[in-house]
Curated annotation (Swiss-Prot):
Gene field: rplP
Protein's name according to its UniProt entry: Large ribosomal subunit protein uL16
Function of the protein: Binds 23S rRNA and is also seen to make contacts with the A and possibly P site tRNAs.
Family per record: Belongs to the universal ribosomal protein uL16 family.
SUPFAM superfamilies according to UniProt: Ribosomal protein L16p/L10e (SSF54686)
Length: 145
């Protein structure tokens, strides 16, 4: 499971997931990737499940990049606890994902294999995604250059 080694603050505010991703919204390392179409919190368990689904399908060929990292702690109070007495203890870690963010990248495999591997990963995630290549952008058109 992915989580930070050290954090400055153990508990953080929930925040808002407005707007589109301004960083990490194109394929940079690999040849193919999946891009989020809606905002969501993706937990470290979901990231790991998607990674395992991809790597099992491509077997030994290819390389996979995880482009998101769960750096936000989500707290939870114990069951049957009265309100008050402070914020709960950190329960799990999430990555805040906005529309347009590339979540996973893959290289070294044919496009059909990459498409199927990334499709399997998409089913493990709580966010609607689309398959993108190094040529396509958020709008879906290919670059002229």
């Amino acid at each position: 499971m992915l989580m930070p080694k050290r954090v400055k603050h153990r508990r953080v505010h929930r925040g808002r997931m407005t707007g589109k991703a301004t960083r990490g919204n194109f394929v940079s390392n690999g040849e193919f990737g999946i891009q989020a179409m809606e905002p969501a919190w993706i937990t470290s368990n979901q990231i790991e499940a998607a990674r395992i689904a991809m790597t099992r399908f491509i077997k030994r060929g290819g390389k996979v990049w995880i482009k998101i990292f769960p750096d936000k702690p989500v707290t939870k109070k114990p069951a049957e606890t009265r309100m008050g007495s402070g914020k709960g203890s950190p329960e799990y870690w999430v990555a805040v994902v906005k529309p347009g963010r590339v979540l996973f990248e893959i290289a070294g495999v044919p496009e059909e294999t990459a498409r199927e591997a990334l499709r399997l990963a998409m089913h493990k995630l709580p966010v609607k995604c689309k398959f993108v290549t190094r040529e396509t952008e958020m709008g879906g058109e290919a670059n002229e250059s």
